[in-house]
Amino acid sequence: MTTIVSVRRNNQVVIAGDGQVSLGNTVMKGNAKKVRRLYHNKVLAGFAGGTADAFTLFERFEAKLEMHQGHLMKAAVEMAKDWRSDKMLRKLEALLAVADDTCSLIITGNGDVVQPENDLIAIGSGGNFAQSAATALLENTELTALEIAEKSLTIAGDICVFTNQFKTIEELNY
């Protein structure tokens, strides 16, 4: 699987992800980019789940963003509705972490849209490790969102065998 973490602090939101693609117990690729910018570079998105499904999900989510003029919450709810009702999408076991200058959301394969506490998202196999690290750093340091995301992803990569140290990091300042 993978680890995706999103942190928001002081007018900055960051989504970071590692690059490991695994097939069972075998590392197939170490430099996959699972985080990208969408909708005129105004929305960040990260993906945890099967890599082959990422392109379809990003494409569909970007279409929803276009349909709703970049309104993240509306696009996320519409994407979740499609995910619940589309037979092909329902088979995907995946999560999307998305963020813009107003909110951070998790979109699940069950059709849920969750706005997490403290605008902190951590998903994937190393998500619990990254979330623990990011929470501690948010509560006990003055580090930037970028620094917290990077450090928490590093910690997750040190602990989780399905997370590596290759990082893709995208940030929005607002």
Swiss-Prot record:
Protein name: ATP-dependent protease subunit HslV
Record carries keyword Ion transport: no
InterPro entries (UniProt xref): ATP-dep_Prtase_HsIV_su, Ntn_hydrolases_N, Proteasome_sua/b, Proteasome_suB-type
Protein's cellular compartments: Cytoplasm
GO cellular component terms, semicolon-separated: HslUV protease complex; proteasome core complex
Protein family membership: Belongs to the peptidase T1B family. HslV subfamily.
GO terms for biological process, alphabetical: proteolysis involved in protein catabolic process
Organism whose genome encodes this protein: Shewanella woodyi (strain ATCC 51908 / MS32)
Enzyme category, top tier: hydrolase
